[in-house]
């Protein structure tokens, strides 16, 4: 109930970007930083990645705030949130987009299997993911990266294993977002939470981190955690065009 009654946090996000800028931080998209980790190395850096897990309309609101601040970021959409109108609008503003893939956990759940069967499913899931990435690029244009999504119903199963140690180019990618980060030193990996859950993981305060000149900071931001709780009830309402599907499109 606490989450349902929570207020929107858009002013908090505006303040975060404003304070980062006033403190001399370079605010970069994840892809821009991966493309050149030494970029703006003379400045402290705030790297922004968005995982659009729910409520795709909230992504448009957050992107509008970034446009006002002159910020570009990287956005990962699940199939259930990849509404054409939303993805195309965000991409047209200059942001990078990619698939927030959940292929392995989805296949296990659809087959009624559990964590014990995950390893044996990996080769098949990799082939499915290859097709999903091609389908995403066909619908929304070329992409350079993808990022795994998790599923708490299958503890210990990580979708990221599908691209770990793989030739990403064979999947039409330059990077897997999580795997690529392993090659770089991040000072703070910051992930947001809903208001009811404390706003930020481990009760970290991004403003304090900025004042302390911590860098680089990777901020993993979920737009649905910033919308009003009542707004989440509209998560499945049509927006900007027909939904691409609750899971994955037909491929083949």
Regions found by a protein language model. Name each.
Residues 1-48, 57-74, 80-94, 104-252:
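Terminal accessory/targeting
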